[in-house]
Amino acid sequence: MNSGLDLEYSFNEILKGFGLSSELAHIIWLPLPMLLVLVSAVVGVLVTVWLERKISAAAQQRIGPEYAGALGVLQPIADGLKLLVKEDIIPAKADSILFTAGPILVLVPVILSWLIVPFGQNLLISNVGIGIFLWIALSSIQPIGLLMSGYASNNKYSLLGGLRAAAQSISYEIPLALSVLAIVLMTNSLSTIDIVNQQSGAGILSWNIWRQPVGFIIFWICALAECERLPFDLPEAEEELVAGYQTEYAGMKFALFYLGSYINLILSALLVSILYLGGWGFPIPVEIIAKALNLPIDAPVIQVFTASIGIIMTVLKAYLLVFVAILLRWTTPRVRIDQLLDLGWKFLLPISLANLLVTAGLKLAFPQFFGG
């Protein structure tokens, strides 16, 4: 389903109908995809926090927030305002420079990773040819910020939390990259746009989840571990480490960790949607929709419809995965640190490597199904 370039053309044609030049119409169009991504990130965090509170309450037979707005929808905003007015404390013997730089180094790579997240054929900030490689590189920076925060706090619990975060990230980054490499091998491209386009043509049957079920499971497990969600929240296990690397943080510095965690969760869900669930692709091919409405496939109405549906489908698939992640957090026990590392090194790493080799063999044997 092509939901970007034709939408831009239709938008420009509408503006030119009001007497604007094509250059001015193009300039007006340029910030819209960026605005969509920024708004999606901010609204996504607010919605996810509200869902987290409501789903956790349901899992524990509680009501959850209900007084701050209808059904408690304003509770995330109240949480943000509370953190905003809290005192920003730096421990007396902490390294103030590293202590301040740590949360920034955690949040910035996650936000930059949104550069390569497409909501449509042209609805992304930057269609770089190495989008997947860029995301893996950026995600490798975050553990440095976590370790820096733990070390700079001059607190034994914070240091242990930072060390755990670094060990956990290294353990799960490799199988995650190998599972993504299998997708890249089938697509012959590192571009997220190309990966989604490769899954179009036959609706839901074209999705990579059917050709890469093992890779999908490995990627999702590793993504949860990278987000430090239960059962993989060892770096901030409250029963053992108080709050891990966050122990000495308060106010807006703590809010940066909080914000980065939820943005990373949404980003991971969006990437699973893009890599394995067809991205903005609708389960029904656009040709069938156009034929049912007795309209040509390049009609402006069809293009606007498919673009709108594409955005909705991308967000819907992502939030289905967010729901699963939240449910797992509140219904599963935490694993031990040795179990966490064993799962990454002894199971996920060899399985992801075998999956990559099998994918290469299937591509040679059946190029029409696994990319030629």
Curated annotation (Swiss-Prot):
Broad EC category: translocase
Keyword tags: Membrane, NAD, NADP, Plastoquinone, Quinone, Thylakoid, Translocase, Transmembrane, Transmembrane helix
UniProt KW Transcription keyword: no
Catalytic activity: a plastoquinone + NADH + (n+1) H(+)(in) = a plastoquinol + NAD(+) + n H(+)(out); a plastoquinone + NADPH + (n+1) H(+)(in) = a plastoquinol + NADP(+) + n H(+)(out)
PANTHER family xref list: NADH DEHYDROGENASE SUBUNIT 1 (PTHR11432), NADH-UBIQUINONE OXIDOREDUCTASE CHAIN 1 (PTHR11432:SF3)
Cell compartments where the protein resides: Cellular thylakoid membrane
Native organism: Prochlorococcus marinus subsp. pastoris (strain CCMP1986 / NIES-2087 / MED4)
GO MF terms, alphabetically ordered: NADH dehydrogenase activity; oxidoreductase activity, acting on NAD(P)H, quinone or similar compound as acceptor; quinone binding
Family: Belongs to the complex I subunit 1 family.
EC number: 7.1.1.-
Membrane topology listed for this record: Multi-pass membrane protein
Pfam families: NADHdh (PF00146)
Assembly notes: NDH-1 is composed of at least 11 different subunits.
Role of this protein: NDH-1 shuttles electrons from an unknown electron donor, via FMN and iron-sulfur (Fe-S) centers, to quinones in the respiratory and/or the photosynthetic chain. The immediate electron acceptor for the enzyme in this species is believed to be plastoquinone. Couples the redox reaction to proton translocation, and thus conserves the redox energy in a proton gradient.
Protein name: NAD(P)H-quinone oxidoreductase subunit 1
Chain ranges passing through the membrane: 27-47, 97-117, 128-148, 176-196, 204-224, 266-286, 308-328, 347-367
Top-rank lineage group of the source organism: Bacteria
UniProt key word Thylakoid: yes
Annotated InterPro entries: NADH_UbQ_OxRdtase_su1/FPO, NADH_UbQ_OxRdtase_su1_CS
GO terms, biological process: aerobic respiration; photosynthesis, light reaction
